[in-house]
């Protein structure tokens, strides 16, 4: 078994693509309008219609499916929810030069929970992990992490 994709429902597709494609450098791989009986059946929403875009990190890995529901209109997450809020809380993007990413995204107005921190123990032998959490435009927590090999 593998993870095929994760899904984020958003309020504004362009604002979200500006974050994931323009700021984070992901590439857009698919763009379609979802509508018809099949989407109504799978979502349980009468007259469901959604704009669907897939993005993917240049380094490969899991795709992100971004949906903006046209009908019914999506409901918002609690703004800037903290990492201890129950439910699916974050996904992680491994980067090189975490400090540069933090500076770049901070300068672009991205909201961070904290600056990068170092995990005080090794999850994998010989690898030190540094990370920070930021919020995407819809409040989804995105972990940026780097693994420093010793």
Regions found by a protein language model. Name each.
Residues 9-61, 125-127:
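Core segments of cupin and vicinal oxygen chelate
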Residues 61, 72-73:
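Active-site/binding-pocket entry motifs
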Residues 8, 64, 92-150:
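Vicinal oxygen chelate
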Residues 36-41, 73-78, 119-125:
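A short, acidic/glycine-rich surface segment
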Residues 1-5, 50, 86-88, 129:
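Short, solvent-exposed beta-strand edge segments and adjacent coil->beta transition regions
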Residues 36, 71, 148-150:
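A short acidic/small-residue loop/turn micro-motif
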């Amino acid at each position: 078994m593998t993870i095929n994709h994760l899904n984020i429902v958003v309020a504004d597709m362009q604002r979200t693509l500006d974050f994931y494609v323009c700021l984070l450098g992901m590439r857009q791989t698919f763009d379609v309008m979802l509508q018809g009986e099949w989407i109504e059946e799978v979502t349980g929403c009468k007259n469901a219609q959604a704009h669907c875009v897939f993005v993917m990190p240049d380094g490969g890995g899991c795709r992100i499916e971004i949906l903006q529901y046209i009908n019914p209109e999506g409901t918002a997450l609690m703004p800037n929810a903290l990492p201890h809020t129950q439910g699916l809380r974050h996904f992680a993007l491994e980067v090189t030069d975490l400090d540069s990413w933090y500076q770049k995204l901070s300068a672009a107005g991205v909201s961070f929970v904290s600056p990068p921190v170092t995990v005080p123990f090794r999850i994998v032998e010989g690898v030190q992990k540094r990370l920070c959490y930021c919020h995407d435009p819809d409040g989804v927590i995105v972990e940026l992490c780097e693994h420093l090999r010793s």
